[in-house]
Structures are given as C-alpha cells and as structure tokens.
C-alpha cells in the first residue's frame, strides 16, 4: 500500500533543476493524492513559463513510479494559488544560504517593481557569507528569472537573492 510519507520522502530527494534544494523544500509541492495504485502530484511552478517544468515532471514520474504498488503517476502544474518565496522551508532557506542565495523574509514593505520582480526596499540585504549589510544590487537579472545578483562590500563576494514573488 502506498502512503503519503513515502511519496514526500521521494519528493524531498528530487533536486530542483535550477536551485540547489529539493522541490519539496522549495515549496513547489501543493498536494499529493493517492487513489489505489495511482498518485497525483500537484506542483506550483515558481514562474509561468519556467523551462524546468518538463524535467521536474519527468523526475517525479520516474522516482514516485519506482515505489512498490504505484502503477500510475500524474503530475499537474497549477498557478493558483501562486508560488511565493514564503513557501520555502526553513531547511530550504538554510540550504540556499550555504550556496550563497538569500531569500526574502516575508516582511517586505511590498515595494517591488512588478515588471522585473525586484525588491526595491531601502534596507540592506544581509550577505549569506559574512552577514554584513554592506551589500549592493549588481543586477536585477540573475541566472534564472527568480534570482537577482548582489555584491558584498565587506567580504567582496557576489551572491544571489531570490526575488520576492
């Protein structure tokens, strides 16, 4: 018999193709439904048009499909409710920080440029390497649509920040 905890453990082992954490810790999993030998996984993409969606779907189908008693796996992407950085688990935030990626704390004043999704707050962003607030935005565009590039003037290291969504 298939149980939800087994599926969640598998989802926690699947890395996001663009971020150094699991799809579960990134908060992409909205719901897991089990009916007999079929599993339905509902996923919230970080952005509409995310190019990693086919890879995520294939990995979920492959890994969950390897469970004993699972005969069918369906993956559905939904956009309502929208994904936000508030869905990232504390473990996910810690894992991202070890890779030099910071996450908005959810206390933003709401001052964002909706055209590019960049936080325009005046307050400094702490460096994930040395925790200094002496940081600057280098580019609102990072390696993926959901990240921006920053620089720490104290330790002289670049770092990325997830955009508040």
Protein language model annotation of sequence segments:
Residues 1-165:
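Domain-level signature for proteins that mediate thiol-based redox and metal-cofactor handling
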